[in-house]
């Protein structure tokens, strides 16, 4: 069985590194991109099985990236986990059309929450 790949789109390098570490410890290949342009390139290069996306990115919002990803039929099916400080303001039902399967609240999440979210969307 091939190792599943997780793309982390996060402009906080420390947080991205923490997520990479916990995902790799749990058997996933994890790569990160600090902004939307690098994320598009990483999707093309890595063909991730799931994307963890910060909503508030430097230079572009996660929502702009969601729109971009959904405009490409070959990658529109990649499940998205939003990771944000704004989780209480978002409804999963409103974001489902954009491929969002889970929303993680950065203000309360633990490393194990990231792994659990990835597992749940890859079932």
What is each model feature region?
Residues 1-5, 110-123:
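Non-catalytic signal-transmission and effector/linker regions of two-component phosphorelay proteins
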Residues 10:
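Conserved acidic carboxylate
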Residues 17-25:
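Charged docking surfaces used in two-component/phosphorelay signaling
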Residues 27-34, 42:
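Short hydrophobic/Thr-rich beta-strand motif most characteristic of the beta2 strand and flanking loop
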Residues 35, 61-67:
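Acidic catalytic/metal-coordinating carboxylates
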Residues 58, 88:
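The feature encodes the CheY-like receiver
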């Amino acid at each position: 069985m091939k190792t599943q790949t997780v793309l982390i789109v996060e402009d906080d390098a420390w947080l991205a590194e923490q997520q990479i570490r916990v995902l790799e410890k749990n058997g996933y290949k994890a790569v990160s991109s600090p902004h939307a342009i690098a994320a598009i390139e990483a999707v093309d290069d890595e063909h991730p099985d799931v994307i963890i996306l910060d909503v508030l990115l430097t230079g572009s919002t996660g929502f702009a990236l969601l729109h971009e990803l959904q405009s490409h039929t070959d990658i529109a099916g990649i499940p998205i986990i939003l990771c944000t400080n704004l989780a209480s303001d978002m409804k999963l039902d409103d974001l489902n059309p954009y491929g969002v399967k889970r929303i993680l609240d950065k203000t309360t999440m633990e490393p194990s929450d990231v792994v659990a979210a990835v597992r749940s969307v890859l079932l």
